[in-house]
Amino acid sequence: MLGRIEGFSERIGSIYGYTKVGIVHFKAFPDVARGEGPIAETLAKIAEDDFFTAVEVGWMRDPRVRNGARKLLEEAHLAVYYATQPAMLTQKLSLNALDPAERRRAIGQVKNCIDEAYDLGARAVRLIAGKDPGPEKRPEAMKLLVDSIHQLCEYAKEEGEIAVVLKIFDRDVDKQNLIGPFSDALALAEEVSKEQPRFGLLADLSHFPLLREKPEEAVPLVRAYLKHAHIGNCVMRDRRHPAYGDLQPRFGVPGGEIDTEQVADYLGVLWNNGFFHQEEMPVISAEVRPLLAGEREEVILANAKRVIKEAWALFQRSRSL
C-alpha cells in the first residue's frame, strides 16, 4: 500500500531523469529466446518506440544479425544491456556446477556472451547462477560461483569497461537457483566485490513473492550493490494456473502477484534506498511476455508501458501527500 515516502521536499519529475527505462527483448518477443528467429524485426519495433531508452538483449547466434542489431541500436540511441540467461538456460549450464568440466563449459559460454555484448555495444552483462545443489553442497557451490564470477569480471576487463551484474532468482519454486535469498546475494556480492568493485546485483520485483521476501526488507540488505532492477509479474498461489512459477505474465493477470500498485511501491523502496541516485544512471526494465492463449506481443508491451507510466505517477503523488 502506498504511503508517505521519506526524505523529499520537491516534485520528482520525469522518470527519465532518474533511470533508463528498458524492456527485455527476448521475453517481450519469445520467438527470439534461443538466439534465432525474427531478432532484427522485433528489435526494430522497440527501436521505433521512444518510450524505451534501454533494451536488454540476449543470445544472437548469427554474427551478421549482431552487426545489424548494433547498427540499429546505435541509430535508435538505445542503451544496451546483455543477458546471458537465454544461452545459459537453454543449454542447462551452471556457473556453480560441481563438475569441473561442466563449470568450464559454462564459463566458456559466458565469455562468448561477453564477446557478443561488446559487439552489440552493451553497457553491462547480466549473469545467472546455476541450480541450488542443496544445503550440504551449497557452501562449495557458492565458492565456485564466486570464482566463476571473478574469472568473468577479469575477462570483461580485457576488452574494455563493461559492468557485470548477477540477477537474484528464486530458490525453491521455479528456477531453484543458488542465488537465491537476498541474504545469500549479499554474502556473494560482499565476497566478489573485494576484487571486483564494479560487480553488482539485479533485483526483480516478480521474484520477491517467489522468495517469500518483501522488497522493503530485502532491498536495504543489498542497496550498496543494487545496480539494475526488473519489474514483472508472477503466479505462485495456484499450481494449476498456466502462468504458475517464474514465467513473467503480463501485469494484472488474474491470479498474479504484481500490478500497478505493487510497481509503485517498489519504486518507492528503490528511491528510499538510493537506487535512483547512483553515479551511473541505473536501468529499470519490464520483463513480461505474451503467455496466455490469444495474447499479442504488441498488447503486452502496451500493458507494461501503461503500468510504468501510472506507477511512476502514483509514486510521485505519494511523495506530495
Placement of each model-derived feature along the sequence:
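Active-site clefts of carbohydrate-active enzymes
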Residues: 238-252, 278-297
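Acidic-and-aromatic substrate-binding clefts and catalytic sites of carbohydrate-active enzymes
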Residues: 29-36, 54-69, 133-136, 172-178, ...
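A short, acidic, amphipathic alpha-helical segment used as a generic capping/interface helix at domain edges
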Residues: 10, 255-277
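Active-site acidic/histidine proton-transfer and metal-coordination neighborhood
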Residues: 3-12, 96-200, 303-304, 318-319
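Hydrophobic faces of well-ordered beta-strands that scaffold small-molecule active sites
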Residues: 19-27, 53-57, 78-85, 125-127, ...
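Short, electropositive alpha-helical surface patch
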Residues: 70-81, 135-149, 177-191, 216-225, ...
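N-terminal pre-domain/capping segments
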Residues: 1-112, 118, 196-198, 302-321
